[in-house]
UniProtKB/Swiss-Prot annotation:
GO MF annotation, one: photoreceptor activity
The organism's taxonomic lineage, starting at the top: Bacteria, Pseudomonadati, Pseudomonadota, Gammaproteobacteria, Chromatiales
Name the record gives this protein: Photoactive yellow protein
Subunit structure: Monomer.
Organism: Halorhodospira halophila
Family to which this protein belongs: Belongs to the photoactive yellow protein family.
Matching InterPro entries: PAS (IPR000014), PAS-like_dom_sf (IPR035965), PAS_fold (IPR013767), PYP (IPR012130)
GO biological process, one term: phototransduction
Gene: pyp
Record-linked Gene3D superfamilies: PAS domain
Modified residues (S-(4-hydroxycinnamyl)cysteine): C69
Function of the molecule: Photoactive blue light protein. Probably functions as a photoreceptor for a negative phototaxis response.
Domain PAS: 23-86
Amino acid sequence: MEHVAFGSEDIENTLAKMDDGQLDGLAFGAIQLDGDGNILQYNAAEGDITGRDPKQVIGKNFFKDVAPCTDSPEFYGKFKEGVASGNLNTMFEYTFDYQMTPTKVKVHMKKALSGDSYWVFVKRV
């Protein structure tokens, strides 16, 4: 399997070629969202970080239903700004704490290579 580095500049090129099984093999969380924040893909590593079953969150709104702790200017605000500008590419640290032990993570949000979707990458700090 191809090595994919968290935060790499061309990460969306590599992920565009991966199927669900390969996404599940990543060492960090990968969530693909539409422009409204609805979950299109949610890999196994993200499920391990949050304790959620990836199959149960597909189609739900990430910011409202799955991780309401991210419905903040620091997270959702950056997402909305990036979607509106068509140029989402930001990295920051955050603490996930909705229905889980507070967990400090590094987040990289980036527009997908094709289509109208966006990636949220997450790794424990």
